[in-house]
């Protein structure tokens, strides 16, 4: 399954259109999104569940989006402390929700010593459980700043690279994205880059509408087939002009 067009991430589904499946679909269609990433797990635990009613908040949202022809990927923040348990919940959630793809969000915890073995164990088990599913890695935008992260172990087993190209405290998306792509083109293995741009506030900073347009335009100039934005929860609340 190829990924093309624009996509957005959902972190806490209740904070995106109140978790209403019909409203989420309408918002995605109005914005022209072709795909959506929903958070399915955090570490070894399922995410976006209502613990009081033991209800899966994602199931109706996923079904509604897929019915509308919008691809749905699950994303999973991983820590590496228990890679076998994290792999098990990844396979379980992805399978039970009938997702179109799976994204591994590996960040600071995976820059700690000894994480190469954890990454290899995790990826082997996830790939065994989901042998034909498209997968992506989502991590730092500048790999040379984070050499400790086991890039190869993750990239060996995924189909796409979705770096987090967040130009916080600045307004320079073009050079940031160009550097991201250049650095990943020099890494082995190379995977098609689908960058994620910021659609949130960090203190007093937030991306401008011009930033967002330049980001998308630069992606096209570089021949990238898709871009993503993080996240629906925060963008519609804090940066409505960006969403529009």
Predicted regions and their residues:
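Aromatic-lined substrate-binding rim segments of carbohydrate-active enzymes
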Residues: 38, 42-76, 113-137
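Substrate-binding cleft of secreted/luminal carbohydrate-active enzymes
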Residues: 166-170, 183, 189-244
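Aromatic-lined carbohydrate-recognition surfaces of secreted/lumenal glycan-active proteins
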Residues: 8-13, 70-83, 119-149, 190-203
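Boundary/entry segment of secreted carbohydrate-active catalytic domains
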Residues: 1-34, 39-41, 76-80, 132, ...
